Protein backbone atom coordinates (compact mmCIF):
# COMPACT_ATOMS: atom_id res chain seq x y z
CA UNK A 1 0.00 0.00 0.00
CA UNK A 2 1.20 3.50 -0.85
CA UNK A 3 0.61 6.65 1.19
CA UNK A 4 1.64 9.73 -0.78
CA UNK A 5 0.66 13.06 0.78
CA UNK A 6 3.06 15.34 -1.11
CA UNK A 7 0.32 17.23 -2.98
CA UNK A 8 -1.81 17.64 0.15
CA UNK A 9 1.10 19.00 2.21
CA UNK A 10 2.31 21.25 -0.61
CA UNK A 11 -1.17 22.76 -0.96
CA UNK A 12 -1.27 23.34 2.80
CA UNK A 13 2.12 25.09 2.66
CA UNK A 14 0.96 27.32 -0.18
CA UNK A 15 -2.08 28.43 1.83
CA UNK A 16 -0.10 28.72 5.11
CA UNK A 17 3.31 30.01 3.96
CA UNK A 18 6.30 30.18 6.27
CA UNK A 19 7.45 33.61 7.37
CA UNK A 20 11.10 34.59 7.11
CA UNK A 21 13.14 32.28 9.35
CA UNK A 22 10.44 29.59 9.72
CA UNK A 23 10.49 26.00 8.45
CA UNK A 24 8.74 22.64 8.65
CA UNK A 25 10.92 19.81 9.99
CA UNK A 26 10.92 16.63 7.88
CA UNK A 27 12.55 13.33 8.80
CA UNK A 28 12.93 10.04 6.94
CA UNK A 29 12.72 7.40 9.67
CA UNK A 30 13.32 3.66 9.64
CA UNK A 31 10.99 2.22 12.26
CA UNK A 32 11.77 -0.99 14.11
CA UNK A 33 8.13 -1.98 13.60
CA UNK A 34 8.80 -2.47 9.87
CA UNK A 35 12.51 -3.28 10.28
CA UNK A 36 12.91 -5.68 13.24
CA UNK A 37 16.66 -6.02 12.66
CA UNK A 38 17.11 -2.42 13.84
CA UNK A 39 16.68 -3.46 17.46
CA UNK A 40 14.83 -1.26 19.92
CA UNK A 41 15.47 2.16 18.36
CA UNK A 42 14.21 3.88 15.24
CA UNK A 43 16.85 5.15 12.81
CA UNK A 44 16.84 8.58 11.15
CA UNK A 45 17.98 8.35 7.52
CA UNK A 46 17.86 12.04 6.61
CA UNK A 47 16.41 15.36 7.75
CA UNK A 48 15.19 18.39 5.83
CA UNK A 49 14.24 21.94 6.77
CA UNK A 50 11.32 22.69 4.43
CA UNK A 51 10.51 26.37 3.96
CA UNK A 52 8.05 26.13 1.07
CA UNK A 53 6.25 23.79 -1.33
CA UNK A 54 8.83 24.38 -4.07
CA UNK A 55 11.57 22.95 -1.86
CA UNK A 56 9.42 19.94 -1.00
CA UNK A 57 8.57 19.32 -4.67
CA UNK A 58 12.25 19.62 -5.61
CA UNK A 59 13.19 16.88 -3.12
CA UNK A 60 10.11 14.72 -3.69
CA UNK A 61 11.84 12.04 -5.78
CA UNK A 62 14.82 11.87 -3.45
CA UNK A 63 12.58 11.45 -0.40
CA UNK A 64 10.47 8.78 -2.12
CA UNK A 65 13.52 6.81 -3.25
CA UNK A 66 15.13 6.90 0.21
CA UNK A 67 11.88 5.73 1.81
CA UNK A 68 11.63 2.79 -0.59
CA UNK A 69 15.34 1.94 -0.37
CA UNK A 70 15.39 1.81 3.43
CA UNK A 71 11.77 0.70 3.99
CA UNK A 72 11.32 3.99 5.83
CA UNK A 73 8.63 6.60 6.34
CA UNK A 74 8.80 10.34 5.69
CA UNK A 75 7.26 12.41 8.48
CA UNK A 76 6.76 16.18 8.48
CA UNK A 77 5.78 18.58 11.25
CA UNK A 78 2.84 20.76 10.26
CA UNK A 79 3.71 23.18 13.07
CA UNK A 80 6.47 25.56 12.09
CA UNK A 81 9.78 26.05 13.91
CA UNK A 82 12.13 29.04 13.67
CA UNK A 83 15.86 28.84 13.04
CA UNK A 84 16.39 31.38 15.83
CA UNK A 85 14.56 29.32 18.46
CA UNK A 86 16.29 26.14 17.34
CA UNK A 87 19.69 27.87 17.45
CA UNK A 88 19.22 28.91 21.08
CA UNK A 89 17.86 25.46 21.93
CA UNK A 90 20.99 23.89 20.39
CA UNK A 91 23.13 25.88 22.85
CA UNK A 92 20.96 24.81 25.81
CA UNK A 93 20.91 21.17 24.75
CA UNK A 94 24.67 21.11 24.13
CA UNK A 95 25.34 22.61 27.57
CA UNK A 96 23.08 19.95 29.09
CA UNK A 97 24.88 17.14 27.25
CA UNK A 98 28.32 18.44 28.25
CA UNK A 99 27.36 18.87 31.91
CA UNK A 100 26.14 15.26 31.92
CA UNK A 101 29.21 14.09 29.97
CA UNK A 102 26.81 12.76 27.33
CA UNK A 103 29.16 13.33 24.41
CA UNK A 104 27.56 10.59 22.32
CA UNK A 105 24.23 12.43 22.39
CA UNK A 106 25.78 15.39 20.59
CA UNK A 107 25.44 13.63 17.23
CA UNK A 108 21.67 14.05 17.51
CA UNK A 109 21.99 17.63 18.74
CA UNK A 110 20.05 19.47 16.02
CA UNK A 111 17.13 17.06 15.68
CA UNK A 112 16.77 16.85 19.47
CA UNK A 113 16.78 20.64 19.69
CA UNK A 114 14.12 20.95 16.99
CA UNK A 115 11.94 18.49 18.90
CA UNK A 116 12.28 20.50 22.11
CA UNK A 117 11.44 23.85 20.50
CA UNK A 118 8.00 25.33 20.83
CA UNK A 119 6.23 25.87 17.54
CA UNK A 120 5.19 29.28 16.30
CA UNK A 121 1.78 27.82 15.34
CA UNK A 122 1.05 24.99 17.74
CA UNK A 123 -1.12 22.11 16.53
CA UNK A 124 -2.55 18.87 17.90
CA UNK A 125 -2.57 15.56 16.02
CA UNK A 126 -5.62 13.32 16.49
CA UNK A 127 -4.66 9.77 15.46
CA UNK A 128 -7.65 7.95 13.92
CA UNK A 129 -7.08 4.25 13.21
CA UNK A 130 -9.95 3.69 10.79
CA UNK A 131 -10.75 4.62 7.20
CA UNK A 132 -14.50 4.92 7.93
CA UNK A 133 -15.36 8.39 6.65
CA UNK A 134 -18.52 8.66 8.74
CA UNK A 135 -16.57 8.10 11.96
CA UNK A 136 -13.81 10.51 10.91
CA UNK A 137 -16.38 13.23 10.14
CA UNK A 138 -18.03 12.55 13.50
CA UNK A 139 -14.70 13.17 15.24
CA UNK A 140 -14.12 16.36 13.23
CA UNK A 141 -17.59 17.67 14.16
CA UNK A 142 -16.96 16.88 17.82
CA UNK A 143 -13.73 18.89 17.77
CA UNK A 144 -15.14 21.84 15.82
CA UNK A 145 -18.53 22.13 17.54
CA UNK A 146 -18.40 20.55 21.01
CA UNK A 147 -14.84 21.28 22.20
CA UNK A 148 -13.74 24.65 23.55
CA UNK A 149 -12.95 27.28 22.38
CA UNK A 150 -16.49 27.50 21.05
CA UNK A 151 -15.84 30.75 19.19
CA UNK A 152 -13.65 28.83 16.74
CA UNK A 153 -15.67 26.29 14.76
CA UNK A 154 -12.82 25.66 12.31
CA UNK A 155 -10.25 24.05 14.58
CA UNK A 156 -9.38 21.31 12.08
CA UNK A 157 -6.72 22.58 9.69
CA UNK A 158 -5.86 19.39 7.79
CA UNK A 159 -6.92 15.75 7.47
CA UNK A 160 -4.00 13.55 6.41
CA UNK A 161 -4.43 9.95 5.18
CA UNK A 162 -2.24 7.34 6.90
CA UNK A 163 -1.75 3.63 6.33
CA UNK A 164 -4.73 2.57 8.44
CA UNK A 165 -6.66 5.79 9.02
CA UNK A 166 -6.16 9.54 9.29
CA UNK A 167 -4.24 12.17 11.19
CA UNK A 168 -6.58 15.06 11.99
CA UNK A 169 -4.40 18.14 12.46
CA UNK A 170 -6.07 20.78 14.62
CA UNK A 171 -5.52 24.05 16.38
CA UNK A 172 -5.28 23.58 20.17
CA UNK A 173 -8.57 22.75 21.87
CA UNK A 174 -9.85 21.60 25.26
CA UNK A 175 -9.32 17.83 25.29
CA UNK A 176 -11.77 16.91 28.05
CA UNK A 177 -14.98 16.48 26.04
CA UNK A 178 -13.24 14.68 23.18
CA UNK A 179 -11.40 12.38 25.60
CA UNK A 180 -14.66 11.46 27.31
CA UNK A 181 -16.38 10.80 23.97
CA UNK A 182 -13.48 8.92 22.37
CA UNK A 183 -11.26 7.52 25.16
CA UNK A 184 -9.39 5.16 22.82
CA UNK A 185 -8.18 7.83 20.40
CA UNK A 186 -4.68 9.22 20.98
CA UNK A 187 -4.00 12.95 20.71
CA UNK A 188 -0.40 14.15 20.34
CA UNK A 189 0.77 17.72 20.89
CA UNK A 190 4.15 17.73 19.13
CA UNK A 191 4.05 14.93 16.58
CA UNK A 192 4.70 14.92 12.84
CA UNK A 193 2.29 13.53 10.29
CA UNK A 194 2.92 10.99 7.55
CA UNK A 195 4.16 12.41 4.26
CA UNK A 196 5.16 9.26 2.37
CA UNK A 197 5.39 5.50 2.84
CA UNK A 198 5.33 2.58 0.42
CA UNK A 199 4.53 -0.65 2.22
CA UNK A 200 6.55 -3.67 1.14
Indicate residue ranges for each PLM-predicted region:
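Signature for HUH/AEP ssDNA processing cores
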Residues: 1-162, 173-181, 194-200
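Short hydrophobic/aromatic beta-strand micro-patches
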Residues: 169-171
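Polybasic, proline/glycine-rich intrinsically disordered low-complexity segments
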Residues: 182-186
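Short, cationic low-complexity segments
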Residues: 188-190
Amino acid sequence: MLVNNFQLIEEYMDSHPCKEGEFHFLQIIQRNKENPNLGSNNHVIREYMVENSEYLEKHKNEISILCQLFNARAYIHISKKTYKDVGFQVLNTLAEYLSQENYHGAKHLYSTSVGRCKSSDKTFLVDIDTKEKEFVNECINCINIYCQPFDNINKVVLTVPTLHGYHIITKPFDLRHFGESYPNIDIHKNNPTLLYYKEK
